[in-house]
Every structure is written in C-alpha cells, then in structure tokens.
Amino acid sequence: MTTQTQYDLVPANGSEFELSVTQVPDEQHIRFWPQHFGTIPQWITLEPRIFAWMDRFCDEYCGGIWSFYTLSNGGAFMAPDADGDDKWHLLNGMNGNGAEMSAEAAGIAVCLIEYSHHACLTECDAMTEHYYRLRDYALQHPESSAIMRIID
C-alpha cells in the first residue's frame, strides 16, 4: 500500500523566505574573507578580482572604500560605499548588457561574476554554494532585473 503525501507549495518570494542582510562592522573586516571563504582554494584572490571586475564594468569606478555584508542564508558579499543615492552604470562587455543601479546592486553583480568564475576555476562546491546564496538574495533585491542583466 502506498500513502500519498500532499505538499503545500509556497511561493519562492514568500516573506518566510525573505533574506536579510547585515553590514559587517569595520573592526571585523580583517576576518571577513577567512571566516566566510577560508576553506575555498585561492580565496585570497577574491577581493582584488572583485575590484578588477568593477573597474572593467564601470567606467566611473576609480577605487574607494567597500563595505562587507552577510546574509541570513550564510552568504556574504561586498559593495562599494556610495555618496547618497548615486547610480552606477555598469556595462558587461562579455554579454553587451548595461544597467544603472545602486552601489549595493553593483557590488552584488560583480561579486556574482567573480564567485561564478572562481567556482569554475577552482571546481569548488563551497564556492558554488556562495554563488547561489548571493544569487538568492539578488533575486529578491529591488534591483534584481538590473543585476541579472549584468550577470546574464
């Protein structure tokens, strides 16, 4: 005899699945990369490569201070600090897509690009998990369409 189980489907964008983001205090920046990415091969290269992606995708970018963030699903990312509500124009020359977005969204986009590249380079499942954790947050972000255009 078989028993059928009925499952209630809940929309993926339901409030119970909503991710929260927390800014990492400045004094904890030194521990950010080893704490969240320390088991991943070549993790030390992530930060400079993220800077390089931003430089490649955003003509106006010329360095600056970045903030670090953690997500309630275990994800983590960094984003440039911005002056007010300034919009950043990113252009991904690899897919021809451009978009204007906030500094946070721009940081998410370039982190996703680097996380994907790093996961392929290292063939590391943990890096792939970091990509999907951040992507889940990006899909809930108010600027998800712009982020997805850049990473497509």
Swiss-Prot record:
Gene3D superfamilies: Antirestriction protein. It holds the Pfam family Antirestrict. InterPro entries: Antirestrict (IPR004914), Antirestriction_sf (IPR042297). Belongs to the antirestriction protein family. This is Uncharacterized protein YfjX. It comes from Escherichia coli (strain K12). The gene is yfjX.
